[in-house]
C-alpha cells in the first residue's frame, strides 16, 4: 500500500507500524484525511504481521487541530466514512496507541478516544471538544466514548463547556492512560509498543476482543450523533459563530487555534450584547 500524502507510515520495526499525521500548518482533518485513514485500515487488516500501530504527529503544537468544517460540509458522506473507520479501529486485532503531543480537539479527540490506549505529554497537550461553543454537537464519537471512559458528569463538563483540558486532568478523569513528562513520552510508548510486538498476535487479538465486550460504541450510536451534525451546521446561530471564528484565526496558525477553549465564552457575550434591548 503506498503511503498516503497526509499519513507518513513507518513499517521498519517488525510487528509495528508508526503513523505520523502531517497536514500543515495545523494538522486539520479534511475529507481526504478520512479517506486515507480508511485506506490505512484496509492495509492494517490485510497484513497479518502487524500487531501494534502507534499514531503520532509531526507538529508538536497540534496532534490534530479539528475537522475542517467547510470542506466537510461539501462532502457530507465523510462522516459515514469516519464512523466506519473508528469502528474498524476499535475492532481490529491490531492494538492502537495514540502518542499525543499538541492540541487534540474535536475530531482529533474523537480519533484518540477510538484508539485502544492514549499517552499524552504533560507539558504540551490540550484536549477538548469545542463544538457546542460554535453551535454544533460532536458528531464523530465523543458523545459515545466519553461517558464510557470518564462517566456521565465529566462527559457533560467536557462537551458542554467546550473548554481545553490539560493532560493531568485527562489522566485524572480516565480520558488517557497516562500523562507523561514530555521527555519520557517517546521512550515509554516505544518500550510498550516493542513489548506488545513481541507477543503472539492471536493472543493480543483474543484479549482485546474479550475486553471490547465491556464497552465500545455501536454503529447506531455513532450514527445518531452523525445525524445531528450537518443539520446543526445549517442553523443561523451556528453559521454566525463560525463566521466570527473565521475572522480571528480559525484554521491557520494563530492564538485562537492555540487557545480555542478560552475564546468560546466571548462569542456568547457578543450574542448578549447584540440581543440587548435598548433602554
Please state what every model-predicted region is.
Residues 35, 49, 57-88, 104, ...:
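Glycine- (often His-adjacent) and acidic-residue-rich active-site loop
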Residues 32-36, 81, 88, 188, ...:
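Charged catalytic carboxylate motif
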Residues 40-43, 81-93:
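Catalytic-core regions built around general acid/base machinery
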Residues 1-56, 270-279:
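Conserved CoA-thioester-binding segment of acyl-CoA-metabolizing enzymes
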Residues 88-201:
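Crotonase-fold acyl-CoA enzyme core
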Amino acid at each position: 500500500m503506498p503511503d498516503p500524502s497526509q499519513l507518513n507510515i513507518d513499517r521498519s520495526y517488525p510487528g509495528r507500524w508508526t503513523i505520523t499525521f502531517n497536514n500543515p500548518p495545523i494538522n486539520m482533518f479534511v475529507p481526504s484525511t478520512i479517506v486515507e485513514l480508511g485506506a490505512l485500515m484496509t492495509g492494517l487488516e490485510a497484513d497479518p504481521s502487524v500487531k501494534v500501530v502507534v499514531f503520532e504527529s509531526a507538529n508538536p503544537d497540534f496532534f490534530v487541530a479539528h475537522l475542517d468544517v467547510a470542506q466537510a460540509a461539501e462532502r457530507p458522506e465523510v462522516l459515514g466514512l469516519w464512523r466506519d473507520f473508528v469502528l474498524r479501529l476499535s475492532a481490529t486485532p491490531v492494538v492502537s496507541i495514540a502518542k499525543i503531543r499538541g492540541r487534540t480537539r474535536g475530531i482529533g479527540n474523537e480519533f484518540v478516544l477510538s484508539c485502544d490506549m492514549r499517552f499524552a505529554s504533560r507539558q504540551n497537550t490540550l484536549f477538548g471538544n469545542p463544538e457546542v461553543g460554535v453551535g454544533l454537537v460532536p458528531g464523530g464519537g465523543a458523545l459515545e466514548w466519553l461517558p464510557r471512559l470518564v462517566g456521565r458528569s465529566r462527559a457533560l463538563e467536557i462537551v458542554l463547556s467546550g473548554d481545553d483540558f490539560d493532560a493531568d486532568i485527562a489522566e485524572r478523569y480516565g480520558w488517557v492512560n497516562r500523562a507523561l513528562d514530555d521527555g519520557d513520552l517517546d521512550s515509554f510508548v516505544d518500550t510498550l509498543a516493542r513489548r506488545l510486538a513481541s507477543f503472539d498476535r492471536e493472543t493480543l487479538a483474543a484479549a482485546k476482543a474479550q475486553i471490547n465486550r465491556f464497552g465500545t460504541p455501536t454503529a447506531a450510536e455513532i450514527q445518531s450523533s452523525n445525524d445531528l451534525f450537518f443539520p446543526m451546521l445549517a442553523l443561523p446561530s451556528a453559521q454566525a459563530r463560525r463566521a466570527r471564528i473565521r475572522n480571528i484565526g480559525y484554521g491557520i496558525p494563530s492564538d485562537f487555534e492555540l487557545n480555542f477553549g478560552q475564546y468560546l465564552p466571548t462569542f456568547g457575550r457578543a450574542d448578549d450584547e447584540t440581543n440587548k434591548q435598548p433602554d
